[in-house]
Structures are given as C-alpha cells and as structure tokens.
Design a protein with these regions (language model features):
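Sec-dependent signal peptide cleavage junction
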Residues: 19-32
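Early extracytoplasmic/lumenal segment of secretory-pathway proteins
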Residues: 32-119
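Ligand-binding "clamshell"
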Residues: 121-128, 148-154, 234, 265-276, ...
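Ligand-binding pocket segment of bilobal, Venus flytrap-like solute-binding proteins
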Residues: 193-197, 201, 205, 213-277
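Mature extracytoplasmic/periplasmic domains
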Residues: 291-352
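Conserved C-terminal helix/tail region of periplasmic/extracytoplasmic solute-binding proteins
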Residues: 348-397
C-alpha cells in the first residue's frame, strides 16, 4: 500500500476541502497546529515527561506523514503528547506476521488486516485493548465493528477499509475487463501483474473457478493452486508496491490491487481505470492493534485514539485514498471522494464481497506450501483452456 501523490491542482483542491470541511473549533478542543485540532476532554500530556518512544509498524506509507506536502500527523502527535514516534513499514500482512514471529523486535502499534488480526489473536500475539483509553472508538461506524475476526473488538480498532479490484490500462486492452478470469486471457501474456502474497492471489484464483475466497479444504487449495499454475505463463511479475511504477508507467495492461491505491494510480496516469470484477471482491478492514510484547500499552492506546480524531482521520483518508470507518470523517470528505464508486462502492459490489476469515492451520499450511511450489512452477499451460478444464473438473466432482 502506498501513499497518495497529488498534482499541484489536486493539492490546491485538497486544501480548499480541508478548510471548508473542518468543523468549527469547540471551546474545549486543543489546536495542535493550523491543520489539526483534537478533543480537549482527553489527557494528551500525561506521558509528556516519561521519555517514551513508540515503535509503530504500518503498511508501506499508509499514513499522512508530510510527504508531497501532506499534513504530517506523526509530528503533530509528537508535538501534542511529547511522545516520540519511530515509524517503520512492511509490504504485506505476511511480512508483518513473519517479523513479529521471528522475535527480537518489539512494536507498540501495528496495522494488520482482518484475517491477520484473527490469526494473531488466536496465537496470543495481541494484547487486549482498554477502550477507556480509546474514547474515539465510539466514532467508528457499526458496519466495521464486531466482525468475525475479532468479536467485540477485544484486540482491534478499525483504521481503514476497502475492496480489491482490477486496475487496467485503457490503451492496452481490447475491451475493458469485467471479470477476474480476464487475467487468464493469453492475449495479455506478459502484460498481467499478480499479487505477490498468497492470501490475495488465492482469493482471486478461487473466484475464477467458482470457489469462496475462504477455502474450506486442502483439496480446494490444490484446485486453486492449479488455477494459479494455469496463469503462470501469462503473468509478467508478482508484485506488491512495485505495481505503482509498473501501472503508472504503462508497463502492464492489468493488475489486481486495492481500491484506495487504484485512486493513487489513476491520479498519476489518466489512461488507467478500475473495475470491481463481477465474480465478487474482497472487502477488508485494516485495523490498529497492540502486540502482546508491546512496551508502552497505554501510550499506544493514546496513539490509536489520536488516529481516530476526526481531523487526523480526514488527513489520512484524503491523502492515502482509502476508505474511512470514522463516521465524522466520511461526512467531512470532499464529495468526489465521498461518493466515489472506487472508494465507497454500492450494494451491488458489497453484497457479493467476502471478508477474509481466519483459516484453519492445515489450510494455511497447504496454502503456504503450494504457493511456494506454484512460484517455482515453470509450465503454466494455456491460461483460459486450463482454467476451463479446472471449472469442468470441479463441476463434475
């Protein structure tokens, strides 16, 4: 995931939006700087003399950090609280999990997606949150709370949400793609990018053969792996953040990615467009959590509460392009973003969307092993033909 890079005109429009959307400062609010005010009913200074440094580990540049003339919400937090922030990034949920599992490092706040929250909670890797220290939790929309990956939100506070979809270059496709299966079309050999993480890649391939994004057996994992092998010769590269340079630079015809990042890419290259494939997409919630070995639990809860402040949430949502779960922030958004079918799709998309569930250990193990096998597979077959045979085999079984 990557921050949003605005043109000069877009930055000017954003400035107007921020000024016009900002609420009138309440009598008890604290003005941190000209861009950010926070609630005065919270003791932001209680750790000011404790010389605390919070280690924050987030998806790749998934925050408004002062880059490209954005509002720096991290430095504003330091100014407000006296707490220092050591901010580092990772490129996928799997990288986050591996880093924490390896030991030897201690983070105070992390940002896993839904299924990874469930996995980490199950393995005792997360600390229960004290919501008394996170009063802004009350501003999160009910749609994003009490989900199956964290019933009662014992371990997580929603940060952003979004969907997956297919971004494509309108000058490089004969017809606009409408299905995930279009990524298996041999006409686009060496012009298709694919996720370089197993969970997203398996989810897409599953939909092309009529299966759920949440596989129910090792046999289903094997069928999905076969579909990915069928695509292998068509794929130019398996990517994560590399997708930005490739799609913005016109180096590939299509790629699956996250809707919020698609907004970034389209802003950089007007030849790009985005579609939610008709088979159904992933609806995801990225959350803020505290690892079980965090050194500064209460200060971490303060940071989470701060990110839920409306002005801070607005700065983040506007800059990175992802969808906010904070009701007050959505109400403050510019209409172009608030009513964007990419960022805030309607019922026709969400009704068919699936949330990633925490998979059983045997299915996770099979996925990891077969993903590694697939990546080293050299004969990908003939795309659609192999996919059609897979569909027939599943229908017969």
């Amino acid at each position: 995931m990557k921050l949003k890079k605005f043109s000069a005109a877009a930055l000017a429009a954003l400035t107007v939006t921020m000024m016009s959307a900002a609420p009138v400062l309440a009598a008890d609010d604290i003005e941190v700087n000209e861009d950010i005010s926070v609630s005065g009913d919270y003791d932001w200074k209680r750790f000011a003399n404790d010389h605390i440094t919070l280690n924050v580990y987030n998806n790749g540049l998934y925050i408004s950090d002062g880059s490209d003339e954005s509002i720096n919400v991290l430095s504003a937090f330091e100014e407000l609280t006296g707490i220092k922030v050591n901010y580092t990034t990772y490129d996928s949920n799997e990288s986050l999990y591996a880093k924490l599992k390896s030991g030897g490092v201690s983070y105070d706040v992390i940002f896993p997606s839904d299924y990874m929250v469930g996995k980490m909670a199950k393995e005792g890797m997360l600390s229960e949150l004290n919501m008394d220290n996170i009063p802004n939790f009350a501003g999160i929309g009910e749609t994003y709370l009490d989900r199956s990956f964290d019933p009662g939100n014992k371990y997580s506070v929603p940060y952003m949400w979004g969907t997956t979809g297919l971004i494509y270059n309108t000058t490089m496709v004969e017809e606009p793609p409408t299905k995930w299966a279009d990524m298996w079309d041999v006409a686009y050999t060496n012009n298709v990018l694919m996720f370089n993480n197993s969970r997203d890649a398996y989810a897409i391939a599953a939909k092309t053969i009529g299966l759920s994004m949440n596989p129910q057996s090792v046999d289903e994992i094997t069928a999905i792996t076969d579909a990915l092998k069928a695509q292998k010769n068509i794929v130019q590269a398996y990517v994560m953040d590399e997708v930005f340079d490739k799609m913005e630079g016109g180096e590939a015809a299509m790629a699956p990615y996250y809707a919020g990042d698609a907004i970034t890419m389209i802003d950089e290259n007007p030849d790009l467009a985005f579609v939610h494939p008709e088979e159904g997409v992933n609806f995801f919630i990225d959350s803020m959590c505290i690892p079980a070995n965090a050194k500064h639990q209460e200060a971490a809860e303060m940071f989470i509460n701060y990110l839920c402040e409306p002005d801070v949430g607005l700065a983040n949502a506007d800059f990175i392009g992802y969808s906010t779960p904070i009701t007050a922030v959505w109400e403050m958004l510019d209409d172009d973003l608030k009513y964007s079918e990419i960022a805030y799709p309607g019922a026709e998309v969400l009704d068919k969307a699936e949330v990633f569930e925490t998979l059983p250990d045997d299915i996770n193990a099979a996925m990891d092993a077969q993903w590694s096998e697939m990546k080293s597979y050299e004969d990908g077959g003939s795309g659609w033909m192999v996919l059609a045979l897979l569909l027939l085999a599943i229908a017969i079984s």
